[in-house]
UniProtKB/Swiss-Prot annotation:
InterPro entries: Bbp1_C (IPR029330), Bbp1_N (IPR029328). It is found in: Cytoplasm, Cytoskeleton, Microtubule organizing center, Spindle pole body. It comes from Eremothecium gossypii (strain ATCC 10895 / CBS 109.51 / FGSC 9923 / NRRL Y-1056) (Yeast). Residues 187-318 form a coiled coil. The keyword Aminoacyl-tRNA synthetase does not apply. This is Spindle pole component BBP1. The lineage of its organism: Eukaryota, Fungi, Dikarya, Ascomycota, Saccharomycotina. Keywords: Coiled coil, Cytoplasm, Cytoskeleton. Homodimer. Pfam families: BBP1_C (PF15272), BBP1_N (PF15271). Its main location: cytoplasm. Component of the spindle pole body (SPB) required for insertion of the nascent SPB into the nuclear envelope and for the proper execution of spindle pole body (SPB) duplication. Connects the central plaque of the SPB with the half-bridge. Required for proper localization of CDC5 at the SPB and for proper M-phase progression. Residues 27-64, 93-135 are annotated as: Disordered. Residues 107-124 have a biased composition (Gly residues).
Length: 353
């Protein structure tokens, strides 16, 4: 049984698939796809390793492989949040499938060589094809917008034409310009993807700003707390310093009261010594002056006495010349014949002492 190009009743070619998808025949495309794949798996016995992240397919909707094969839009309830945030890929289906590793139309239609205009890929042997229990993984199928030349999208967005447009007898006017909304649809999807990316970046910026505001708030609170703690520490330090100063003043006063100031006492004694020294010097000077005065006085007295003595001696000498020596009275001897200057020296020393 072939996939495409077979004219038998049980065969399903590309045209039958499209007609069934658009017009809704007796069998849904998903049921035909499952039946064809199960038959192909039974005939070919594909043995491939099971995907670690595979999950069971949904029986009530189209499979992701089927949507990827025919480039159909996904369900609104399945993967809506992830598709809105993912960027729109405007590349051809074959190129995107080869780069992302997701089987496209050419990959799934490669079972029959030369069908559908000679597809550029064969049957993907790496996909899970076990009908009895092993499901295909659909989480690796990336969202791709339909191509502009997709007949399904063109048929969905085509404007209905009037059946009377080609009747004869009407005035031939300008042929209406066919407006293909496919490009607008793709541009809208691309704009939505860009908006989603901008919203995502804006959300990240807002989260970063909120995180920065939280950090700044925490830093400000911590700074105020540390500032208050430092103020308290400074107040306690000032109080402790004041108490220490007062205690030191009291200790110094007690020490001065118990022990006199020896330095002051020494200075007083030194002053007394200086005063006594000056007094002694003055006393010595007075004694020297008194001694000099007495010496001069005694010298004057001595000179006077010597003068008198010489005068008397001269007188006696004259008398002696007049009278003989034998007649001189022994009782008239001068009282100074026994004078000695030692007596005067001892007397002066006694006065000085």
């Amino acid at each position: 049984m072939g996939w495409l190009g077979d004219n038998s009743e049980d065969s399903t070619g590309a045209v039958r698939w499209v007609m069934d998808a658009l017009l809704g025949k007796r069998e849904s495309p998903s049921q035909k796809y499952r039946r064809e794949f199960a038959q192909d798996d039974t005939n070919n016995r594909l043995q491939v390793p099971r995907s670690a992240g595979a999950r069971r397919r949904r029986t009530g909707s189209l499979d992701s492989e089927f949507r990827a094969r025919y480039e159909l839009l996904p369900d609104e309830t399945e993967g809506a949040g992830a598709s809105l945030l993912s960027p729109v890929d405007l590349r051809p289906a074959g190129t995107a499938a080869r780069e992302s590793g997701t089987p496209g139309r050419a990959g799934w239609a490669g079972g029959a060589a030369g069908t559908l205009g000679g597809g550029d890929g064969g049957c993907d042997g790496g996909r899970d094809g076990d009908t009895f229990g092993r499901a295909r993984g659909s989480e690796d199928v990336a969202f791709r917008p339909p191509r502009a030349d997709n007949p399904l999208v063109s048929a969905l967005f085509a404007q209905p034409s009037s059946p009377d447009a080609g009747l004869p007898g009407s005035f031939p006017g300008r042929a209406p310009r066919a407006r293909d909304p496919t490009h607008d649809y793709l541009a809208l999807l691309d704009q939505l993807a860009r908006n989603n990316r901008d919203l995502h970046s804006l959300q990240q910026d807002l989260e970063a700003r909120e995180e920065r505001d939280r950090r700044e708030t925490s830093y400000r609170d911590r700074y105020l707390q540390l500032r208050q703690e430092l103020i308290q520490e400074l107040k306690q330090s000032k109080t402790m310093y004041d108490n220490y100063t007062a205690l030191y003043e009291r200790y110094k006063a007690l020490k001065d009261a118990e022990h006199p100031d020896y330095a002051e006492l020494v200075s007083k004694l030194e002053a007394q010594i200086v005063d006594l020294t000056i007094a002694d010097q003055q006393k010595d000077r007075r004694h020297q002056e008194e001694l000099l005065r007495l010496q001069l006085q005694y010298e004057a007295r001595i000179h006077e006495l010597e003068r008198k003595l010489n005068h008397q001696n001269s007188t006696y000498t004259a008398n002696d010349t007049a009278t003989p020596a034998s007649t001189v009275d022994s009782g008239s001897i001068s009282p100074y014949h026994k004078y000695n200057d030692t007596i005067d020296t001892q007397f002066l020393n006694h006065i000085v002492k």
